[in-house]
Structures are given as structure tokens and as C-alpha cells.
């Protein structure tokens, strides 16, 4: 459960993500594809080369969805219901992949935010992204 302090840290950090959604998202996806190659199987129709328009476009979608989740931290289930349905019923993405992408996104945040990505921010984002992953996996039960 996110505390009031967690929510403040997440919101303040998210303000620094604004304007970089496409870059951060593409970088997180590229890290995931390199670190966890089996994740590429969910993107057979994509050009997965670094900097491809498809990876950048999907990265932007992912980070924008996270932005919507930040705005709806108190009601993630409702905010992410459509995405949960899409990934569970249409795309049939193994839910473990949400955690893998979360890890990669946290690395991107740490790289770009440097000292501003404090242990407290890391802990808050870890809780937040775990909650997002859990909500996205709800429809699999």
C-alpha cells in the first residue's frame, strides 16, 4: 500500500518524466529486450532495432499509461482495467513480463535522474510499479 509520502515522491518524480515519455519508454523496452530476450516474442511484427519508430511509439504508450496510473494511484484497478483486459484476453502476455519491464523502467529512471533517484524514491516506485503489475495481472485469475 502506498503511503502519502510515497505518493508525493512518485508525483514529484513523475513531473521529471514529463516530456521524456518516448525516450524513457523506448529505453526501458530496449533494456527489457536485451536483458530478457524471450520478451521479444510478444512483438513479432515490430522492428526491434534500437531507436525504431515502433519501439519508440510503444514505449511512449507504456509510459503514458504509467502516467495515467500516477494520476489514479488511489484507483489503479479502474484506471488500468482496459489495459488489463487487453493484455490478458487479447495479447495473452505472461504477467511476469510486467515485473520485468518495471525493473527496466526503474533502471531508466535511475540513469536519467541520478542522485534525485534516492533510495526513498526507488522504494516508492518499486511499490507503485508492483501495484501496477498486480492490477494488470488481475484478469488472469
UniProtKB/Swiss-Prot annotation:
Residues 1-141 form the Globin domain. Heme b binds at residues 58, 87. Keywords: Heme, Iron, Metal-binding, Oxygen transport, Transport. One of its GO terms (biological process) is hydrogen peroxide catabolic process. The keyword Metal-binding applies. PROSITE patterns: GLOBIN. The keyword Heme applies. Heterotetramer of two alpha-D chains and two beta chains. This is Hemoglobin subunit alpha-D. It comes from Aegypius monachus (Cinereous vulture). The lineage of its organism: Eukaryota, Metazoa, Chordata, Craniata, Vertebrata. The gene is HBAD.
Amino acid at each position: 500500500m502506498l503511503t502519502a509520502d510515497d505518493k508525493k515522491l512518485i508525483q514529484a518524480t513523475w513531473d521529471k518524466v514529463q516530456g521524456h515519455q518516448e525516450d524513457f519508454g523506448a529505453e526501458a523496452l530496449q533494456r527489457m529486450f536485451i536483458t530478457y530476450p524471450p520478451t521479444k516474442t510478444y512483438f513479432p511484427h515490430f522492428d526491434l532495432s534500437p531507436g525504431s519508430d515502433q519501439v519508440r511509439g510503444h514505449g511512449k504508450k507504456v509510459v503514458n499509461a504509467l502516467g495515467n496510473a500516477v494520476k489514479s494511484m488511489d484507483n489503479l484497478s479502474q484506471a488500468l482495467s482496459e489495459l488489463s483486459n487487453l493484455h490478458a484476453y487479447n495479447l495473452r502476455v505472461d504477467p511476469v513480463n510486467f515485473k520485468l519491464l518495471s525493473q527496466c523502467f526503474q533502471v531508466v529512471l535511475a540513469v536519467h535522474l541520478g542522485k534525485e533517484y534516492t533510495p526513498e524514491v526507488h522504494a516508492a516506485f518499486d511499490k507503485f510499479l508492483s501495484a501496477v503489475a498486480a492490477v494488470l495481472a488481475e484478469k488472469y485469475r
